[in-house]
Amino acid sequence: MNAGRTVSRCTAACTLDSDYILARQTLLRLRADVYNARSIDATGLNTMPYDWVPITRRKPLVWPGGKRLALIVTMNCEFWDLVKDSDKPYYAGGPPMLPDPMPGNVADFPNFTWREYGQRVGVWRLFDVFEEAGVPLSVTMNAKTALERREIIDHVKSRGWELVAHNYEQGELLPAHAFDEAAERKLITETLRVYEQVVGKKAKGWLSSSLRSTLHTPDILAAAGLTFICDYMNDDQPYLVQTASGPIVNVPYSIEINDFTFFHRRAMTSKDALEMLCGQFDELYRESKTTGKMMNIGLHPHISGHPHRMQFFRDFLAHAKRHDEVWWTTREEVAAWYLQNHRSHIA
């Protein structure tokens, strides 16, 4: 970043690279042409690549077949390196079981093996529960999961479930390259290459590790031919994200309805979590009588894959399946449908 070029925005002064500003302004003009953006500051650096449209100003969303609530169960199949080439504390893209993170170049066996439980045992237990219920999973995978834990991915493929690209390694977060677009593009490109090699087709969507992306991420994904991103958790409906290569769809993920939040951030019991899941489902289903809504449930095998949590999932799935107007779907299906129908929702 060139400290010699200063751009004033409002009353604050920011030191920014002029080439970067020009690129952002060009991109914002492209977005404005397509999406009529109205709230862009001098640099665009404080503006997200979509319009702020409150749900009260949208037309009713009608899902395929007249369904009311789109329900997506997301299973995150992630991989963590045992050590990193760094003496900085290793953030693994989620809270540890034991606190006080160790340096990245020192093996942290308790936390590593706790996470590995999900790969060795927990994921298979969860697969059984969802297969018995006849419920499809949307499975996100790190590229290293595909390379190092191929049997998990082969099982998902054999069931015809969705696979979503989910970064290269879970602890390598995209914001590490926030000021180096070429490095971020290289990481994403390599992730997508492994996806295509293992899955046998090109990826359609992306979820960033720890949901942490950069200003460049949507543009890089769209230029690579992807149709959706899942990083923005600001809605109960999909919407368009504008890029220089055309729009892609945000299919929202959720931290609120997420096993990490239930069991590790809030120390909830399975009974508490079931009450919260059913409460979320019931209210969204009630609201969806007038406009379609979507609900995402985020799961991690090392969190949810323990024996004492299985009945919790069976009970929730049974509750949801008693409602006929639920669309049990995937992110790719939602994105493909929304790209064709968004004009009847947000004009």
Describe the residue ranges of each PLM region.
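Composition-driven detection of intrinsically disordered, low-complexity segments
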Residues: 6-7, 30
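Catalytic alpha-helical scaffold of carbohydrate-active enzymes acting on polysaccharides/glycoconjugates
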Residues: 40-249, 274-297, 303-347
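A conserved mid-domain beta-alpha-beta active-site/ligand-binding segment of alpha/beta enzyme cores
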Residues: 252-281
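Short, positively charged and aromatic/hydrophobic N-terminal segments
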Residues: 21-24, 30, 35-42
